Amino acid sequence: MEWLEATCASAPNRLTAMTPTEHLDNSAPKRVEQLIRQAEHSGASDIHLQMIGKAAEVAFRLDGVMIPISTLAEDVAERVFGRIKFLARLKTYQDSLPQDGRIDKATVGAQNDIRVATYPTVTGEKIVVRLFASSVTKSLRELDYPAEVCNELESFLRRNSGLLLLTGPAGSGKTTTIYSCLRFLAELGGRHVITVEDPVEQIIPGIMQTEINEARALTFAKAARHLLRQDPQTLVIGEIRDEETANIAVHAALTGHMVIATLHAGSCQGVFERLLLMCEDSYAVVSAVQLVLNQRLIRRRCQHCSGVPCSVCLSTGYHGRIPLVEWFRVETTMRAKIRNHGPGVIEPQGSLAQAARELLDRQLSDESEVKRVLG
């Protein structure tokens, strides 16, 4: 009994005698969890932490724009960086080489799993924490596309073969559109659908999903080549990055498969120009492509503050994004024109500028945002 009383009496003294270093070590997990919760609450897609001199700058990528959030003192930053790398199963002592890892959502109470990428810079280590989107996949009709675009997509997805290409810069919503297409196909049923992704961001029941791993030589091209032996009816390629993948996609679309892929280009015309450069058979390219979507995302005016800064939009005046889209359906007569005169004859339906004007007329965004996105 005397021993128990002595132990209890000494416990508060041990707590109050905690050193500053011990306190920082204990606070790092809480700071990391708070950052993740704040980012998820605001709808941020990424958390950026950058060592600059004796401090680390913290910023969120919110609706495609970098928003400064806070500054961490050097001693705090070191422990926060170490905690993030520990959770992602990376080498905590390594700050001179890039590293990639994942954090299980359960370890930090996050909504979804988290991707971590570190990189050495001249001012110190940089960490980007990617927060994967909500596990609830939106339907095509929930993407804020014009009705005509939804109709075109649904019509294509009911086909048995052909190539659908999505284009636009990084962060323009292409992956979100692909997942909505996958949801539509899963609900349609009756098909064997296989994906090749980098990375897999959402699990779609009923879809066979594959994640590339370049460290183990599993590239888009290699995965797509082998997956064609898995008897797919629909093949989804996260990104066409090289000539081999491009030729696989075109060949598959011409041999009874539906293929959905993304390709970096600035316009519907640019998609054909790039694909024709990447593929050996120009006739096959024009025959395979059925539908092209070119899109951007524009920030929506915050409906909670109507332009007056508020906590919902982190004082930006914007909350959420709306797609600007133009599309091109390839019909028989147009195929002949493209073969005879080249991609210059392509005239997409709608235009990004026209879509932006319609949003301005509805007061859903503003001129400065249109200029930022379209130039």
Please give the residue ranges for each predicted region:
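Short, flexible helix-loop junctions that flank or precede catalytic/ligand sites
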Residues: 2-375
